[in-house]
């Protein structure tokens, strides 16, 4: 899935895969890189790669798929990181108010989850028994 946000002068490319190493290798090959910033052999469920922002105005978001579907906790977590990278790229600082961040984060979550649902992707909403909602 690809997004383009002209207002923030940024492009976003999403990879949803069972094996994120394959996605990482595609990105490394595309950009002729041997190593990507901050990616090591630690197992992870999602990552936002922002090292291509200065040159290509491009952010990658990688989310691991499972048999249960795309984990919404992981997805929204990574969208938060995506939001902060977009805002930092545009010179916003998280100081007097966090409202611009919150507005973009809410819109991105809504648009991305809506697009996944529209495209028939299976979403998984894990239940955390330590958080009680009545």
Please place each PLM-identified region on the residue numbering.
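Catalytic Zn2+-binding segment of zinc metalloproteases
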Residues: 79-97
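Post-HExxH zinc-binding segment in Zn-dependent metallohydrolases
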Residues: 93-126
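Active-site scaffold of zinc-dependent metalloenzymes
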Residues: 25-69, 82-85
